[in-house]
Amino acid sequence: MSFKPIDPKRDEIRRYLERGSVLDSLTKLFIRVIKERPENPMDYIRNHIGVVRHQHDKYERLQQDLQLANEEIQRLRAIINGINPDVLQGHQPVASSEVVVATEAPQTVAESTEAAEQQQQQQQQENGETELEKPNESSADVAEITAAVEACQIEGNSVVTTDEAAQPSPTVQAEASGSSE
């Protein structure tokens, strides 16, 4: 057998088709035709030629959704971290046992907040400290903020890194292969 050099034009076309993932798509399609053995292979190829591209588009859309969700998480964390800790300082945290039915919860929170304010005022008077009341701040507002902060339990590392997002998960692959049938 003699060795034939690869025609440069052929090699250029092959690289072009590989770059556009055309060869990969066609190979997968031909493998499915061989496995399923449809009655009319040409119709099957015509109907399923864009499925691989659809899967790629779906994967890109999911990556964009993940990125938007991560940005939203970062934005909300900044808001939570931006809450003035001085406003919340000295108030008793709302325990999960104190959370009652929705109609009773505001009263319980308000009562515990008032008790905490009285304790704080007594401590300040004993220590000789005086604090001016803030006119725009009511005990209900403070109680609401305290309850909201206590209810927000953000995990430390819940944001998916870009490297993790770049790896397709087995469930996405299974879903994509299951939808093409």
Curated annotation (Swiss-Prot):
It comes from the Eukaryota. One of its GO terms (molecular function) is transcription coactivator activity. Belongs to the AMY1 family. This is c-Myc-binding protein homolog. Residues 168-181 have a biased composition (Polar residues). It comes from Drosophila melanogaster (Fruit fly). GO terms for cellular component: nucleus. Residues 111-127 have a biased composition (Low complexity). Keywords: Nucleus. GO terms for biological process: regulation of DNA-templated transcription. Coiled coil: none annotated. It is found in: Nucleus. Residues 111-145, 159-181 are annotated as: Disordered. The keyword Nucleus applies.
